[in-house]
């Protein structure tokens, strides 16, 4: 299992598809549609913010914990499906979901007790057991690291209104804080080998040379880990040469 991680607008979904097409495996995307909790979560944020502005310093969003456990459950179900075949690609990591629960807690939308319970649940779910038939962590975690400017440029390009800083200026601070949390998360991550891709340097969507460079970096790591045979690796290398002709 190969898992893609990275902040909003980093290019996770694009690289997930590129990599799955390259390896001939299945892509499993972040569950964002048909989410019954998301609308009431956003409404809960508004209500909690108004209450805090009126002096209720303890006001939280009653749906913050619910939303994150919903994502946790959906993500774990995706892991079980993706694990059924070698080198399937997962769009977003269950591990990085903790970043968003932590952010909700720091912003006052969730309580410290809720965060501790969520964190304990995540760790219990993902704990590797020596007698289990399969492990739950990925064979390789690929993280796309981007700067604030690159993130905003891509957010504008894809045009989701609720992500735009000109629609909601408070997102500027939120995005900067989120970038810092991702930096901390990358430094602490130890559940599997981690490969960091420079999303500022490589435009793997629009530029063929950049795409090949990123693919070769990932595939070299997969060869090293034993997820690709030498013959498979050489076949992919030849395909890259053909692409660049």
Please state what every model-predicted region is.
Residues 15, 19:
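Hydrophobic positions on the alpha1 helix immediately C-terminal to the Walker A/P-loop
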Residues 59, 63-134:
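Glycine-rich phosphate-binding loop used to anchor ATP phosphates in small-molecule kinases
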Residues 21-68, 73-74, 99-103:
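Conserved substrate/cofactor phosphate-moiety recognition/catalytic segment
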Residues 12:
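Conserved lysine of the Walker
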Residues 4:
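Hydrophobic anchor at the beta1->P-loop junction of P-loop NTPases
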Residues 7:
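P-loop (Walker A) phosphate-binding loop of NTP-binding proteins
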Residues 100-180:
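A glycine- and Lys/Arg-enriched "phosphate-lid" helix/loop adjacent to the NTP-binding pocket
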Residues 156-245:
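NTP-dependent small-molecule kinase module
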